[in-house]
């Protein structure tokens, strides 16, 4: 079985700076694998047998040049890495991202596609579903467990009140939640071995992808202004204290 696990590179949250204008400055933010996609990579590694092949795939802009992140991906189980880099994919919305991934996936060849439920930055939860639609494949999201029985997969979806169990044949698309596993920390041997694994770097023209006419435009991302706290503490439940609390709430709402 050939498994492709798709991932997104996102900025390191602790390095993002909020400017006085409430915009976000990413200048000093290093790239990292989106946390939800670490679960997808781990799920692929746990599912694969010795005879299977795992390929990791991502599309994007300048963040893909980060050699540290490339090694991190390959140290987590994939046998090869595919990168599609184009300036137009730097801030692509889900539909364009999905079209680029689908084109690359068809060129690579696959049996099973595994995505994280959403990305660690926007968490739109759309890309995996859109790729399945573009490729006309069955798609299951909210996947919390995967078992393998030959070429049949037994999938669990943990819902609000129950757990669905679904049998599925490949080819298919799975979007896994963070509950499916705890991603392992790569061993030193795996990190050293990652440098010997193949990295395939493509441009948009290599997969016949071009940006579509936008149905929506990402104008910007802003942080909501923080409300100054009043620092009023009421530490008892006497009638007087309750009346005081009510008075403070009235003032805050008016």
UniProtKB/Swiss-Prot annotation:
CDD domains xref list: ETF_beta
Q: Which InterPro entries match?
A: ET-Flavoprotein_bsu_CS (IPR000049), ETF_a/b_N (IPR014730), ETF_b (IPR012255), ETF_beta_N (IPR033948), Rossmann-like_a/b/a_fold (IPR014729)
**Keywords from the UniProt entry:** Electron transport, FAD, Flavoprotein, Transport
* UniProt keyword annotation of Transport present: yes
Q: Name one GO molecular function term.
A: electron transfer activity
Q: Which SMART domains match?
A: ETF
Q: Which GO terms describe its biological process?
A: DNA damage response
Specify the domain of life of the species encoding this protein.
Answer: Bacteria
Extract the Pfam families matched here: ETF (PF01012)
How it assembles, according to the record, is: YdiR and YdiQ form a heterodimer.
Protein family membership = Belongs to the ETF beta-subunit/FixA family.
Protein name (database record)? Putative electron transfer flavoprotein subunit YdiQ
Q: Which gene encodes it?
A: ydiQ
């Amino acid at each position: 079985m050939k498994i492709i696990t798709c991932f997104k590179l996102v900025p390191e949250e602790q390095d993002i700076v909020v400017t006085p204008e409430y915009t976000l400055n990413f200048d000093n933010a290093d790239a990292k694998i989106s946390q939800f996609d670490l679960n997808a990579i781990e799920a692929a590694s746990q599912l694969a047998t010795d005879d299977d092949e795992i390929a990791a795939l991502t599309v994007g802009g300048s963040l893909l040049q980060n050699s540290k992140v490339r090694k991190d991906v390959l140290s987590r189980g994939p046998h090869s890495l595919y990168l599609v880099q184009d300036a137009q994919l730097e801030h692509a919305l889900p539909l364009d991202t999905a079209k680029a991934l689908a084109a690359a996936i068809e060129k690579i060849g696959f049996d099973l596609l595994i995505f994280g439920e959403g990305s660690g930055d926007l968490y739109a939860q759309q890309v995996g579903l859109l790729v399945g639609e573009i490729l006309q494949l069955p798609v299951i999201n909210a996947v919390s467990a995967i078992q393998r029985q030959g070429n049949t997969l037994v999938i669990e979806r943990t819902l609000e009140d129950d757990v669905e169990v679904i049998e599925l044949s490949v080819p298919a698309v799975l979007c896994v939640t963070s509950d499916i596993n705890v991603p392992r920390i790569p061993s030193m041997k795996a990190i050293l071995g990652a440098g010997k694994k193949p990295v395939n770097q493509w441009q948009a023209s290599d997969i016949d992808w071009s940006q579509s006419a936008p149905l929506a435009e990402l104008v910007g991302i802003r942080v909501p202004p923080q409300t100054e706290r009043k620092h009023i503490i009421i530490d008892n439940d006497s009638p007087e204290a309750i009346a005081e609390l009510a008075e403070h709430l009235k003032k805050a709402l008016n």
